[in-house]
Amino acid sequence: MANDFLFTSESVSEGHPDKVADQISDAVLDAILAQDKYARVAAETLCNTGLVVLAGEITTTANVDYIQVARDTIKRIGYDNTEYGIDYKGCAVLVAYDKQSPDIAQGVDRASDDYLNQGAGDQGLMFGYACDETPELMPFPIYYSHRLVERQSQLRRDGRLPWLRPDAKSQVTVRYVDGRPHSVDTVVLSTQHAPDITQAQIREAVIEEIIKPVLPPEMLKDTKYLVNPTGRFVIGGPQGDCGLTGRKIIVDTYGGASPHGGGAFSGKDPSKVDRSAAYAARYVAKNVVAAGLARQCQVQVSYAIGVARPINVTVYTEGTGKISDAKIAELVQEHFDLRPKGIVQMLDLLRPIYEKTAAYGHFGREEPEFSWEATDKAAILRAAAGL
């Protein structure tokens, strides 16, 4: 990529229909893990006007009221009025869970290459990424896209902007000069709103109360603001669009700054490497950058179903590494256990911590439960690299 360019990332709020689905799926997962930490869960959700459908594969000893979990999640998000198109009290919730296939279970329960360890729950490839564009070691565009819709939610919940409704989207376009963020070129923010507010009022409030308090002022240089550019956003959430689990995988990760292996996260227990290995790859990449081994780091891992050890662990630092990418990859394999069971132990993943991940990004958030955001291996890596 050229050194001078524009790059865009987007995010969506907790009230976006796809995020409603993600949060319900992860709330179901958490409710199960709270009772049965070894459960196998693949919980999918569809939500539309007045309707929630829960489907997938679950094998567990837990006794969970799935319908109540779905209603509680919808209530927490803020869909508590029939005028919003879905109401936690009155919506229909259909449950259609099956059990995990025994053909899959036999490979996960016992790995074909290591009988003392758990095999991967599926084949696949996963990526982790980190860079020094923000203190959280995340790309600037996706980090601030998340913070914008998070701010929208805060102002809706605390009543400062009472006409806001749960659904919102943000998009941040950043101008890079010499490969570094230089300024914010364009901000798009679309927010659902009450019908009796004017476009002029929305625009002023969004720019002054949401955008400017979030974005660094030194980055706002001739920035273009596009606020509700269609002119009206009253119908939103699951009424405006059907929501599905796993439809916001780029929002969930790095906003397009890194490749994505294609596997979604929400609703999946840690035996699914789509989720756990992507978290581990972020943990690896963040520690590499925190150690000063590179300014940016992309990690790819891949697995075969029923096999514990990753097929490959590949590191790419885009020319920013202090040592070779191959040497960093060697250090990664020496200091991180990337077998599925090793990941679960390393990051303490058998906990009901996942609903919080399902909105505003799985990465780049300093939450106490987000063990994959720790940089506790940075000093070890730095010493091992001889820096």
Curated annotation (Swiss-Prot):
Annotated L-methionine binding lies at: E57, Q100, D241, K272
What cofactor does this protein call for?
Answer: Mg(2+); K(+)
TM ranges are none
Which positions bind ATP?
H16, D167, A168, K169, R232, F233, D241, R247, K248, A264, K268
Output the PROSITE patterns linked to this UniProt entry: ADOMET_SYNTHASE_1 (PS00376), ADOMET_SYNTHASE_2 (PS00377)
Return one GO MF term: magnesium ion binding
Kindly report the protein's main subcellular placement as a broad class. cytoplasm
Mention one GO biological process in which this protein takes part, according to its record: one-carbon metabolic process
Where found?
Cytoplasm
Keywords assigned = ATP-binding, Cytoplasm, Magnesium, Metal-binding, Nucleotide-binding, One-carbon metabolism, Potassium, Transferase
Question: What positions does the entry give for Mg(2+) binding?
Answer: D18
Q: Which reaction does it catalyse?
A: L-methionine + ATP + H2O = S-adenosyl-L-methionine + phosphate + diphosphate
Judged by the first EC level, this protein's enzyme class is: transferase
CDD domains associated with the record: S-AdoMet_synt
List the EC numbers from the record: 2.5.1.6
In this chain, K(+) is annotated as bound at: E44
Where in this protein does the record put region Flexible loop? 100-110
For this protein, the record's HAMAP family field holds:
S_AdoMet_synth1
Q: How does it assemble?
A: Homotetramer; dimer of dimers.
The name on file for this protein is S-adenosylmethionine synthase
- Gene transcribed to yield this protein: metK
